[in-house]
């Protein structure tokens, strides 16, 4: 239980002066507390269980404190997914660093497939990813910023590879969406049929996506023959 917040907030919005109350500026610490509480609800019970009242109860904050940091529940939900995406991007970029564009794209694919195959990553991100995917149908505007963030490093490498001539003439944004669709389909299939061989799925998905980008067969073979990458985040949620 967060016992220090009521003391911090006892003057919330109460800097009185002639003409009324002066609005306080957002506090990054309180913003983080609200976001953390909301993320825990979404992660454990889903978006439908999230409410402003529940967040205020768990954080011991008042209504003014909430609306000083978020305009609405929808903005809070969008912020939860964006925060999750930013943490995921840190992990993906670690995997993609010091690689040429072809290997970086393969590393992004491999990193996202960790949702299905890496127990520690899956335990932290699976529920949030499922919730985000569900919201793509119910309320796409809430998760669009999060998806753009997760796709950003992939789009950057696709753009670079296109400029260097390592890919065929491609539309990086469109190809990133297509690659994400292939990866997510295989993640869901593995969750439904867990006996499938992870190594074979990784190889097949990477090969399929790289072929679609126009990568030469010998370059694909070289990528697939590389030793398994060191996976930052194994044994942790990041």
Predicted regions: what they are:
Residues 27, 31, 77, 81, ...:
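Amphipathic, non-transmembrane alpha-helical scaffold segments
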Residues 30, 34-42, 50, 84, ...:
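Short hydrophobic clusters on alpha-helical segments that form packing/core surfaces
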Residues 33, 41-75, 79, 83:
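Helix-turn-helix
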Residues 79, 93-121, 175-179, 202, ...:
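Hydrophobic alpha-helical connector segments
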Residues 95-96, 123-133, 186-193:
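Secondary-structure edge/capping motif, primarily at the C-terminal ends of alpha-helices
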Residues 1-18, 148, 152, 156-163, ...:
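C-terminal peripheral helix-coil segments that are non-catalytic and often amphipathic
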Residues 116-138, 155, 222-226:
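Amphipathic alpha-helical segments used for helix-helix packing
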Residues 89, 136-164, 173-178, 185-188:
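Amphipathic alpha-helical packing segments from all-alpha helical-bundle domains
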């Amino acid at each position: 239980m967060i016992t220090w917040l009521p003391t911090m907030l006892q003057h919330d919005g109460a800097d009185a002066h002639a003409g009324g109350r002066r609005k306080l500026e957002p506090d990054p610490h309180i913003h983080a507390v609200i976001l953390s509480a909301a993320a825990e609800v979404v992660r454990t019970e889903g978006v439908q269980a999230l409410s402003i009242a529940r967040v205020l109860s768990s954080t011991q904050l008042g209504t003014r404190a909430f609306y000083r940091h978020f305009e609405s529940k929808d903005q809070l939900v969008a912020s939860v997914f964006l925060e999750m995406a930013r943490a995921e991007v840190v992990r993906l970029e670690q995997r993609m660093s010091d690689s040429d564009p072809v290997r970086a794209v393969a590393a992004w694919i491999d990193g996202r497939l960790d949702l299905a195959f890496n127990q520690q990553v899956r335990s932290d991100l699976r529920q949030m990813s499922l919730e985000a995917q569900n919201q793509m149908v119910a309320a796409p505007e809430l998760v669009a910023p999060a998806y753009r963030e997760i796709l950003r490093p992939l789009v950057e490498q696709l753009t670079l590879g296109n400029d260097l001539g390592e890919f065929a003439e491609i539309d990086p944004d469109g190809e990133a969406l297509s690659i994400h669709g292939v990866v997510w389909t295989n993640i869901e299939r593995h969750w439904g049929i867990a006996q499938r061989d992870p190594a074979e799925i990784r190889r097949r998905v990477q090969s399929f996506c790289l072929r679609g980008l126009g990568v030469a067969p010998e370059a694909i073979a070289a990528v697939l023959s590389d030793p398994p990458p060191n996976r930052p985040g194994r044994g942790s949620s990041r």
